[in-house]
């Protein structure tokens, strides 16, 4: 399973990359706004900076919600760097745009997916990735991980090549559950990635090893 970090913060991306386990980055308009990045030109520069840090796919989202606008923005984003994956919302014009991009050899990430039906259409249109939102489904008492499992099974049944990218990951349990049901990728905050390292017995064991070493070696 691949690990992507869900952020537009360059320092967090560098820190995650330094761990040696980072496979890519996902961003969205909210994350870009959080970093105070204004204007298309500055956004494009920021995407290029991210691509220079990470040797992996970088999802950059279109803002337009109509077909023509998505095509224009998506082609501009794809031209920035070979690592760019154009992120497109799972709406009617989005599915049309994904088909267009697929025919042009431009890779896509179909985002804001909340049902297996949406995921099925995205794969049929040729999406490179599909992003079911685990945490947001859990927030409304639906089974986010269950949706990931359902999509994985559907794709295996019909041999779709679209990768299941579990998004809206809130904690380490989400990561492990998505791994168990066969997600190809999880994208999550740095805190969740680092959280996988934490276990009290590791800390206790290390403390004992060091204490025993000092008894003998001073």
Curated annotation (Swiss-Prot):
Pathway: Carbohydrate degradation; pentose phosphate pathway; D-glyceraldehyde 3-phosphate and beta-D-fructose 6-phosphate from D-ribose 5-phosphate and D-xylulose 5-phosphate (non-oxidative stage): step 2/3. The gene is tal. Coiled coil: none annotated. The active site is at 87 (schiff-base intermediate with substrate). One of its GO terms (cellular component) is cytoplasm. Belongs to the transaldolase family. Type 3B subfamily. Transaldolase is important for the balance of metabolites in the pentose-phosphate pathway. It comes from the Bacteria. It comes from Phocaeicola vulgatus (strain ATCC 8482 / DSM 1447 / JCM 5826 / CCUG 4940 / NBRC 14291 / NCTC 11154). Transmembrane segments: none annotated. Keywords: Cytoplasm, Pentose shunt, Schiff base, Transferase. CDD domains: Transaldolase_FSA (cd00956). Its main location: cytoplasm. It catalyses: D-sedoheptulose 7-phosphate + D-glyceraldehyde 3-phosphate = D-erythrose 4-phosphate + beta-D-fructose 6-phosphate. This is Probable transaldolase. GO terms for molecular function: aldehyde-lyase activity; transaldolase activity. One of its GO terms (biological process) is pentose-phosphate shunt. It is found in: Cytoplasm. Gene3D superfamilies: Aldolase class I. InterPro entries: Aldolase_TIM, TAL/FSA, Transaldolase_3B, Transaldolase_3B/F6P_aldolase, Transaldolase_AS, TSA/FSA_arc/bac. Its EC number is 2.2.1.2.
